[in-house]
Amino acid sequence: MIDLSRRAMLAGLTGTAVLATLSGPALALTEDQAVSYVQSMAADIEKTINSGRSDAQMYKAFEQLLNQYADMDTIARFALGPAARSASSGELSAYTAAFRTYLSKKYGARFREFIGGDIQVQGARKDKRAVIVSARAKPRGQSAVAVDFHVSDRNGKVFNVILEGVNLLTTERTEITSLLDQQGGSISNLTAELKRRS
């Protein structure tokens, strides 16, 4: 069983792939296309990890990877839960910006622990609305763990990651809605708290 600190570190590697919008026409994504996409993402993550950048530069680079490989607007709305439906456009915009930075710092902080590690794609299979790409993530000096990337058949982006049975998408929603409750249901207060934690 993977320990919590190791799970958090591995989550940092796969945090670019949590959720992308499921609206719009289907792309009829092939397994080969999904594999190629995940391989490209993994290569960019490894390149960033091994770049020798400072922590601040790593966080910024990770935020760019999130923007490139995931629909961050949709991720933020999903994580916020039902409260997103009643939020004003201004509240949602401010929250989304804060959430994006918060997420990049949260997972980016674990990057250095993976220097010298890698992600190896094992194969892919079709699912209802996605192609599931199976991989093995191996931190330096530790055993490899199973990671499943769910790539949307509608927009070609990764919309969820299952890391040793842990659903990263629902994990983020649980954490953000809990923070929202702690802030009395105020989205503006939640936004301020996310900024404080970033």
Segments and roles (model prediction):
Residues 1-16:
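N-terminal secretory signal peptides and thylakoid transit peptides that target proteins
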Residues 17-23:
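Hydrophobic h-region of N-terminal signal peptides that target proteins for export
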Residues 24-28:
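Sec/Tat signal peptide C-region and signal peptidase I cleavage site
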Residues 31-107:
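Early exported N-terminus immediately downstream of N-terminal targeting peptides
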Residues 47, 53-57, 86-90, 113-116, ...:
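Surface-exposed, polar/charged faces of alpha-helical domains
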Residues 105-145, 193-198:
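Surface-exposed, charged secondary-structure patches
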Residues 144-170:
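Short beta-strand edge/turn micro-motifs at domain boundaries
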Residues 163-198:
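Low-complexity, intrinsically disordered terminal/linker segments enriched in charged
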